[in-house]
Design a protein with these regions (language model features):
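Conserved, mostly hydrophobic/aromatic
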Residues: 1, 52, 157, 204, ...
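Short glycine/threonine-rich loop-to-helix capping motif typified by GTGT followed
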Residues: 100-105, 140-152, 178-192, 219-228, ...
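Flexible, glycine/charged-enriched surface loops at secondary-structure junctions
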Residues: 121-132, 161-172, 238-249, 272-285, ...
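Catalytic alpha/beta core domains of metabolic enzymes, predominantly
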Residues: 134, 138, 145, 149, ...
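Intrinsic disorder at enzyme termini
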Residues: 264-351
Length: 432
């Protein structure tokens, strides 16, 4: 990364090779997945000792979860320097599976509560453990949503500490660019999405941010990784946004949006607590059900035309659709339904004919139908209703009438659909 490394390798023996040539005190070092273990932490400490580095000066985020790895993290607490973060509560991964922003904040808050509760039950000072955690929050393409999410997360943390009688403690907040927002179609647009996502994190006050190459879904190339790193540094440093503690403070729009999101996030947290806490909410399927329901609502908005995606439903580019790597199969991407539609259409493209009538509505309906068909990568032939010979020669599978409700008398054409009925269907993808 630009200023930090995130390690995922399960083999502790590979750690020395991975960090060869790396000045440990100069960067942040994080662990996740199979690498987030006490063994990896001890291996890193031994490596730092061999190099003569002061362990207390290292910026370490071990990334232990607040549920199943809680005991392991609490056991490390006594020996680890105070600056080392042992726990991480990850809302980003659940965001990618479909959770709304409020549900994600509620889940993170529930994870933080579980950590503090577990520390108190183990006889430790929960206030000391409060400084041992970081959170991972999703940054969507909507910059304002990212700003509000970061600011609301800090409000929820402050509220949780206050409710627990713990003195205010800074929360290390990591903003991660959403993977849910990405598309295989016109993948270069993902660079724009990542830029606006990280802008939201920078204005919202994220302590660290991570972006991804625009081609991540099909395998990041070096150029994509470099661009993502440059965007991160631009937003965190060169933009100057980090010079202010809270660049968005005082904006009525941002303040209200933050307040509304914090209120909704606290309600989501209370719902999880009422279900028995985060562990029970996950085991019962409550969190997964929330993600599926939110994804379904998101899909419905896309179908109805209430939301759009650049390069997917707006300004789509014709061409084949690549396949995403298997590791991203669990991500609930709104663009996926359009990608599937494009693959289906390209596998067996129908012969489409747009028949233009003489009514005043014909031109507008034609433009709307061309935009709609472009979502599926379909290119229709366009003829006037009076071009009988050309219509017969086209041998269309489907005739779409613009400014007309039926095929002109005497013309033999394929299945006829009136453009008006298609455009008014309420499901622009289903009609395709």
């Amino acid at each position: 990364g630009a200023t930090a490394l995130l390690l995922r390798t399960a083999d502790t023996g590979a750690l020395a090779a991975q960090l060869e040539g790396v000045v440990l005190p100069a960067i942040g070092i994080g662990f996740e997945g199979d690498a987030a273990t006490p063994d990896h932490y001890h291996t890193l400490m031994a490596l730092a000792s061999e190099r003569g580095d002061d362990a207390g000066l290292l910026d370490i985020d071990l990334g232990l979860g607040p549920l199943h790895a809680l005991a392991a993290g609490l056991a490390l607490h006594a020996e680890a320097p105070a600056a080392h973060r042992l726990f991480r509560v990850d809302g980003w991964s659940r965001h990618n599976r479909g959770l709304t922003a409020a549900q994600e904040l509620g889940l993170i808050t529930a994870g933080l509560a579980a950590m503090l509760r577990g520390a108190a039950s183990a006889g430790l000072n929960a206030g000391d453990i409060a400084s041992r955690v970081s959170v991972r929050l999703a940054l969507p393409a909507d910059s304002f949503a990212g700003v509000a999410a970061c600011r609301a997360m800090r409000r929820l943390w402050d509220g949780l500490l206050s409710a627990c009688g713990i003195a205010p403690t800074p929360l290390v907040l990591g903003g991660y660019a959403s993977l849910r927002m990405m598309s295989l179609l016109d993948a270069e647009v993902n660079m724009l999405r990542t830029t606006t996502a990280l802008l939201g994190g920078a204005i919202g006050g994220a302590d660290l941010m991570t972006g991804f190459g625009h081609d991540l879904l099909t395998g990041e190339r070096e150029a994509g990784q470099r661009t993502a790193r440059l965007v991160q540094v631009m937003m965190m440093a060169e933009s100057g946004l980090s010079a202010s503690l809270d660049p968005a403070s005082g904006s009525p729009f941002i303040e209200q949006r933050t307040e509304d999101l914090a209120t909704a996030g606290w309600a989501a947290f209370q719902a999880i607590e009422a279900a028995g806490g985060l562990a029970d909410a996950i085991d019962s399927g409550m969190i997964e059900d929330q993600a599926e329901a939110a994804s379904a609502r998101r899909e419905q908005r896309l179908r109805a035309g209430d939301s759009d995606l650049l390069g997917v439903t707006l300004q789509p580019v014709a061409g084949p659709v690549p396949d995403a790597s298997a590791e991203f199969a669990g991500i609930s991407r709104p663009a996926a339904i359009v990608e599937h539609l494009r693959r289906t259409a390209l596998a067996s493209p129908p012969r489409l004919l747009i028949l233009r009538g003489a009514s005043d509505s014909a031109a507008g309906e034609e433009r709307a139908m061309r935009r709609l068909l472009a979502m599926a990568g379909l290119q229709p032939v366009i003829l006037g209703a009076d071009e009988a010979e050309a219509i017969t020669a086209a041998r269309p599978d489907v005739v779409i009438g613009c400014g007309m409700t039926a095929v002109p008398h005497g013309l033999a054409a394929g299945s006829f659909r009136a453009a008006a009925s298609i455009l008014d269907s309420g499901d622009r993808l289903g009609c395709l």
